[in-house]
């Protein structure tokens, strides 16, 4: 059965940090003050929750249930053969009105061993808006020891934890891959489109000033002594940093990949300037950033799209193109690339 692209309703919900007004404005959602994230085209739940985080279709059905009922129409045979009914991707909008806490995410091996999950949480940020002189924390600035970090966590030494990070300047159009295990933080006011593995796995190194009990909920139920084994203690070298960061400035007049090739095993994202260039058939999530256009498919007709629309595009809709407007398309990895990802 050939399915059609679907414009998704907003999927904002409460979180432990402040923000969300820009998401509400872009996506016609509820906005802030404590809804700093929207999960777009999500078949992933919040950690420990049954349905929170799941996207709904306009008819009220969970996207996850629609996929489970007909995975091949949504994904195509190659994806289903490699990944089953997993979307292999989670797409979010992040709009923090306060600095995110220093935190990190486990990799696949740790998640498999300790949580019986098939995915860790390598993620990447596409900077949509940022204040002048905005920065993100990306890895420790020098090699740390587990007991030293654990002591900072026990003492709730937020200043020391933040000072321990390498701070990287960012601007709109930058894209940063954040490998699992990397300690990181995002400053207030940076509006981000995030792609990640389809889990909600975060370990907190600090939580003062946030609406979360880190002693209870900051370690994935494993205890800090265990969860700290998922943390990368050595710094990201200058050479490695170049492999993680790409800057396009959103200026291309042609379709352009936004990430470095290091991201290929986890997810893909392309800027679509509305020039009508073809995107190959496959499960896709499209966020319209500017203007109005027509999304044309080979199998399922056309649909009008506009600023702030978010769509899920099934494989069975066929090849497609965006004619007018500007958007970012987010896609899961190709199976061959995913097989090589650590």
Residue ranges and their predicted role:
Residues 1-145, 208-247, 269, 335-336:
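Transition-metal
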Residues 94-99, 107, 130-133, 182-201, ...:
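Ligand-binding loop in jelly-roll beta-barrel domains
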Residues 134, 277, 291-296, 310:
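Short beta-strand segments in beta-sandwich/barrel cores
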Residues 155-204:
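Loop-centered beta-sheet repeat module
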Residues 165-177, 294-317:
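Short acidic-glycine-tyrosine-enriched beta hairpin
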Residues 266-273:
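A surface-exposed beta-alpha-beta supersecondary segment
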């Amino acid at each position: 059965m050939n399915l059609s692209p679907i414009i998704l309703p907003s999927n904002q919900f409460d979180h432990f940090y402040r923000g969300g007004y820009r998401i509400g404005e872009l996506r016609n959602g509820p906005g802030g003050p404590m809804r700093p994230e929207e999960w777009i085209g999500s078949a992933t739940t919040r950690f420990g929750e049954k349905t929170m985080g799941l996207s709904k279709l306009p008819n009220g059905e969970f996207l996850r249930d629609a996929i489970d009922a007909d995975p091949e129409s949504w994904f195509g045979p190659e994806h289903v053969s490699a990944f089953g009914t997993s979307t292999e991707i989670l797409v979010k909008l992040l709009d923090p009105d306060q600095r995110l806490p220093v935190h990190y995410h486990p990799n696949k091996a740790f998640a498999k061993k300790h949580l019986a999950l098939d995915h860790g949480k390598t993620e990447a940020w596409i900077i949509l808006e940022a204040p002048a002189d905005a920065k993100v924390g990306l890895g420790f600035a020098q090699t740390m020891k587990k007991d030293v970090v654990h002591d900072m966590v026990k003492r709730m030494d937020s200043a020391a934890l933040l000072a321990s990070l390498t701070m990287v300047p960012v601007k709109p159009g930058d894209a940063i891959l954040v490998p699992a295990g990397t300690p990181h933080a995002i400053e207030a006011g940076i509006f981000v489109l995030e792609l990640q593995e389809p889990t909600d796995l975060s370990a907190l190194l600090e939580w003062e000033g946030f609406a979360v009990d880190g002693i209870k909920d900051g370690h994935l139920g494993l205890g800090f002594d265990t969860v700290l084994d998922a943390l990368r203690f050595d710094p990201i070298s200058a050479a490695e940093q170049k492999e993680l960061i790409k800057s396009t400035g959103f200026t291309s007049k042609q379709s352009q990949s936004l990430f470095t090739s290091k991201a290929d095993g986890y997810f893909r994202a392309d800027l679509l300037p509305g020039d009508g260039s073809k995107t190959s058939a496959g499960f896709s999530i499209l966020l319209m950033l500017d203007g109005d256009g027509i999304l044309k498919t080979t199998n399922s007709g056309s649909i009008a799209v506009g600023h702030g629309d978010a769509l899920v595009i099934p494989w069975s809709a066929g090849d497609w193109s965006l004619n007018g407007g500007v958007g970012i398309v987010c896609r899961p990895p190709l199976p061959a690339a995913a097989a090589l990802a650590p």
